Amino acid sequence: EEAITLYNKIILGGQHDSSIYFNLGNSHYKLNNVAESIYYFEKAKLFSLKDEDIEINLAFAKNMTIDSIDPLPKSDLLRFREYLFDLFSLNEYSFIIILFSWLTAIFFGLYLFNSKPYSKRFYFSFSLLSMLFLILSFSVSSLKSSIKKEEIFGIIFDRKIEIWAEPNFRSENLFSLHEGTKVQVLDSLQEWKKIKIANGAEGWIKEAIIKNLN
């Protein structure tokens, strides 16, 4: 618990990175805090997309949850989009955009100020190639940033919550969810929130504790 207090102080101080969230997740996992451990491992993933240790520990933490939800199969287009998104973080894409901007400018400048035909073709080809990667990186980064703002995901911290067909208790009670389950928040109406889970099921919850990952 002392470690949890220490890491929380570091986060409150404005420091955010995968190692802090990963260690915080481990600390909660050792205390069998289901929702907290999953939440912080998911936060760590946002900063380090390709870290196997995070994925392994997250899988262990998910084994403590009550809800067993089979995700919907993904289309080839969606898998390809996720592949591009997971290649680099937004910060890494920003660096790549700056890098290819400089390379495009340098190669085009060398093309303009070089008099040898072979060299001009060489520099012009590389300037076009750099520009192509610049456009691709910018497009993927912009799309990823836009979707990240629109898609709000969170972890349920309530022991158990009921999911309703409409935002009132007179509607049909569809199913229940438990702590540690990851949901997507689609809409909100006063104290109600419309959520979606990995298998595509949707419904409304009221006064639930959902800690956003975004």
PLM segments and residue spans:
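Boundary regions of SH3-family modules and the immediately adjacent low-complexity/disordered segments
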Residues: 30, 34, 117-158, 164-172, ...
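Membrane-embedded alpha-helical segments of integral membrane proteins
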Residues: 73-112
